[in-house]
Swiss-Prot record:
The active site is at D67. InterPro entries: Metallo-B-lactamas, RibonucZ/Hydroxyglut_hydro, RNase_Z/BN. The gene is rnz. This is Ribonuclease Z. CDD domains: RNaseZ_ZiPD-like_MBL-fold. Zn(2+) 1 binds at H63, H65, H143, D213.
């Protein structure tokens, strides 16, 4: 898994930071990309990456403020144009009202999509998605309007098959290897091959938590518990805690406190006020690292491998 930030600014675009959008790239795990929020000009930012819109199969919206959703109608339309040969359905998760917003934009603009949008409007905490390899949980944060955070949990995967040991034990390479990998006991040439003797320990899945705008809250700690990566907003420097609270946001220190309390491995800060440019960004990093050392302030198009 990899994460890439398409926009890291707060409120409105600036010369150095676009509005909010984050791509969780799971190409190796499921050949998909999941998008978290879709602020204005997100599709333009995508043009500066290797992301293919048709690979985006799920979009998770944290809340309905414009800097998190104004890019949706344009992106959804362009996804249809750019994916004419492979029209795959898209799942859209978000607060109640996201369906009305999207459909109104498409209807008024006369836009017609070549794929289906499956809307999943959320009004309470809980598990919102599960398949054989992933689960997604959501909970309510503390912002000025209804706002969500998301916890993406990769399920543990079967360990590596020791092919050399099987060959040395007399099992020829072929379909029987696959059966053992699936956990089946195999009898061959008078011998019994038990999977537990030839498969290593399970590979522990990654946990990624991506939060919308929020004050410091215990909900954030729960969503981020023992996560490999936490993406937390840090609109303000530590000295502006009163302003942060008044506007429903967090400071660098508050975000780092959440990461520390939750036992998070890596903390990436986003939703940075336009007032922080140049050396001031370094100040934000230092403030957070004083509390949680493994912290970085993301910038537009920044990408890193998770774990």
């Amino acid at each position: 898994m990899e994460i890439q930030f398409l926009g890291t600014g707060a409120g409105q675009p600036s010369k150095s930071r676009n509005t909010q959008a984050i791509a969780l790239k799971m190409l190796d795990e499921r050949n998909e990309i999941w998008l978290f929020d879709c602020g204005e000009a997100s599709q333009h930012q995508i043009l500066n990456t290797a992301i293919k819109p048709r690979k985006i199969t799920k979009i998770f919206i944290t809340h309905l403020h414009g800097d998190h959703i104004f890019g949706l109608p344009g992106f959804l339309s362009s996804r249809s144009f750019q994916s004419s040969d492979e029209q795959t359905d898209l799942d859209l998760y978000g607060p109640v009202g996201i369906k009305e917003f999207v459909l109104a934009g498409l209807r008024i603009s006369g836009s017609h999509l070549g794929y289906r949008i499956n809307f999943h409007e959320i009004d309470s905490a809980g598990k919102i998605f599960e398949d054989d390899s992933f689960e997604v949980y959501t909970d309510l944060l503390d912002h000025t309007i209804f706002c969500l955070g998301y916890r993406v949990v990769e399920k543990n995967r079967v360990g590596e098959l020791d092919a050399n040991a099987l060959k040395e034990a007399g099992l020829p390479f072929g379909p029987l290897f696959g059966k053992i990998k699936k956990g089946e006991v195999v009898d061959y040439d008078g011998k019994t091959f038990d999977p537990k003797d030839y498969i290593g320990a399970d590979k522990v899945g990654k946990i990624v938590t991506i939060l919308g705008d929020t004050r410091k809250t215990n909900t954030a700690v729960r969503l981020a518990w023992q996560a490999d990566l936490l993406v937390h907003e840090a609109t303000y420097e530590a000295a502006e805690s009163k302003m942060a609270r008044a506007h429903g946001h967090s400071t660098t220190k508050q975000a780092a406190d959440v990461a520390k309390e939750a036992g998070v491995n890596r903390l990436l800060l986003t939703h940075i006020s336009a007032r922080y440019v140049g050396p001031l960004v370094g100040q934000l990093v230092r403030e957070a690292q004083d509390v949680h050392a493994n912290t970085f302030v993301a910038k537009d198009l920044y990408e890193e491998k998770i774990g």
